Amino acid sequence: MDKTRTFLDVKEYPDTEVQKNRVLTLEEWQEKWVSRRIGFHQEQGHKLLKKHLDTFLKGENGLRVFFPLCGKAVEMKWFADRGHSVVGVEISELGIREFFAEQNLSYTEEPIVEIPGGKIFKSSSGNISLYCCSLFDLPRANIGKFDRIWDRGALVAINPGDRECYADIMLSLTRKGFHYLLAVLCYDPTKHAGPPFYVPEAEIKKLFGSICNIHCLEKVDVFEEQHKSWGIDYIIEKLYLFTEK
């Protein structure tokens, strides 16, 4: 039997009961940046996004693209360089400042009037705006609607108990004709507490299926040596494309 196929077709766990009460605070996420525990950051960008970029963009120009829990994702620069307008939200000010520094972009910063303590960082070119605040506070900032959402490291990072609220916010930000690209991870949740959390396909359909057509574009075995420390022996990344029903 083909070993790769065996891994990629591994049976999904029916629910996330074992992880449902797991909670990380915003302060804990900020501490991850300070202590450099940011293994989720991909310096070369996301391979599956690169591969399916044309499917995601559909050859359209001047799109508004949203990055939830953006960190310092290099893909934000990719989209900006293609002429699109990028908006991200990230709780770590350190992560946002590192993005601009590492991409050699000058920027301005100002307070978010609607969110006490929040800040918005804007590239001097004007096509990248990063909000430093909780994603769950973001609706108060009236950031408008988006043509595209790239959700990698966001749904899998928020506390499982917050997923319904998260999905409602994401869908409220979509514009007619939107494309939403989601990357999730499949592993044995009884062996790793997360994050990243395990999000089964059934829950994805429950959260987004009433509004979206859901199509799995690809499954990839992404298991690496570092994952052994999680106590797991396989991890599959799945890429989904949501389109408007």
From Swiss-Prot:
- Please give the catalytic activity noted in the UniProt record: S-adenosyl-L-methionine + a thiopurine = S-adenosyl-L-homocysteine + a thiopurine S-methylether
User: What biological process terms from GO does the record include?
Assistant: methylation
Q: Which InterPro entries match?
A: SAM-dependent_MTases_sf, Thiopurine_S-MeTrfase, TPMT
SUPFAM superfamilies to which the protein is assigned, alphabetical: S-adenosyl-L-methionine-dependent methyltransferases
Q: Which PROSITE patterns match?
A: SAM_MT_TPMT (PS51585)
- Residue ranges spanning the membrane: these are none
Question: Where along the chain is substrate bound?
Answer: 40
Listed EC numbers? 2.1.1.67
Q: Give Gene Ontology CC terms.
A: cytoplasm
Covalent S-S links between cysteines: none
Keywords in alphabetical order, please.
Acetylation, Cytoplasm, Methyltransferase, S-adenosyl-L-methionine, Transferase
Entry's localization field: Cytoplasm
Kindly list the positions annotated as binding S-adenosyl-L-methionine.
Answer: 29-40, 69, 90, 152
Q: Where N6-acetyllysine occurs along the chain?
A: 58
**GO terms assigned for molecular function:** thiopurine S-methyltransferase activity
Similarity section: Belongs to the class I-like SAM-binding methyltransferase superfamily. TPMT family.
Subunit record text: Monomer.
From the Swiss-Prot or TrEMBL record, give the protein name.
Answer: Thiopurine S-methyltransferase
Organism of this sequence: Lycaon pictus (African wild dog)
